Amino acid sequence: NPPLVLFSLDKKSTSLQLYKKANHIGINILSNKQKDLSEYFANNKPEWGNVKYFLTNNDIPMIKNSVVNIDCEKIKMINQGDHLIFICKVNKIKIDKNKKPLIYLNSKYIL
C-alpha cells in the first residue's frame, strides 16, 4: 500500500501534454506568502524562469519555500468529463510545519 495522491487538470490546460508525458511529477502546496506565485502559474503558460526551485533525484522541479513538496510517480490517468485525473504514488514528501498553506476558496484567497 504505497501512499497515493491524485489531482485533476482541465483538458484545455496548457500544461496537460507535459503531465501526460511525464513519469515523475512534482506537487507543491504553496505557503500563504506565495499568492503571487499562485497567480503567476494560474494566469500564464507555466514557465519557471524566475521561480525559485530545487530539483529532486528524479530531476523534478520543486518550488522553494512551499509548505509541502511531493515527489510522485504517475501510475494512472483517468478520463472524467472535461478533466483528466492523475493518480500518483508518493516517493518522497517534504513538509515545513512552520508555514501555513495558501488556500483558495470561493474565488478568493484566504490568508
Give the positions of each predicted feature.
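Basic, polyanion-binding surface patches
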Residues: 1-111
